[in-house]
From Swiss-Prot:
The gene is MT-ND3. Keywords: Electron transport, Membrane, Mitochondrion, Mitochondrion inner membrane, NAD, Respiratory chain, Translocase, Transmembrane, Transmembrane helix, Transport, Ubiquinone. InterPro entries: NADH_UbQ/plastoQ_OxRdtase_su3, NDAH_ubi_oxred_su3_sf. Belongs to the complex I subunit 3 family. Its main location: mitochondrion. One of its GO terms (cellular component) is mitochondrial inner membrane. It catalyses: a ubiquinone + NADH + 5 H(+)(in) = a ubiquinol + NAD(+) + 4 H(+)(out). Core subunit of respiratory chain NADH dehydrogenase (Complex I) which is composed of 45 different subunits. Interacts with TMEM186. Interacts with TMEM242. Gene3D superfamilies: NADH:ubiquinone/plastoquinone oxidoreductase, chain 3. This is NADH-ubiquinone oxidoreductase chain 3. The chain crosses the membrane at residues 3-23, 55-75, 87-107. It holds the Pfam family Oxidored_q4.
Length: 115
């Protein structure tokens, strides 16, 4: 009974807040508020300029190695298993695959900034 009551109250509050948000439009839209902010000065150029593709490649490479760290962090807890060889083989496979990917990026000159 208590669970149903909590779910009903949460759903009701959520629906009320969503309908209020849709019914009340933004009344004060100023051009100064919607323009990009550059340290208190007027913008020198358009804020919608495209980025270099190198930024995206470096960001994707960073995300891959960040995921590697996230996958390797549970290794101390995995060391509690009886079959430690399997854990070490999987960790070495993950590190070697990522090392091969890094070597491929390096050979393809994906990490060099000079164009």
């Amino acid at each position: 009974m208590n669970l149903m009551l909590v779910l009903l109250i949460n759903t009701t509050i959520s629906l009320v807040l969503v309908t209020i948000a849709f019914w009340l439009p933004q009344l004060n839209i100023y051009s100064e508020k919607s323009s990009p902010y550059e340290c208190g000065f007027d913008p020198m150029g358009s804020a919608r300029l495209p980025f270099s593709m190198k930024f995206f490649l470096v960001a994707i490479t960073f995300l891959l190695f960040d995921l590697e760290i996230a996958l390797l962090l549970p290794l101390p807890w995995a060391a509690q298993f009886n079959n430690l060889n399997l854990v070490l083989i999987m960790a070495l496979m993950l590190i070697s695959i990522l090392a091969l990917g890094l070597a491929y990026e390096w050979i393809q000159k994906g990490l060099e900034w000079v164009e």
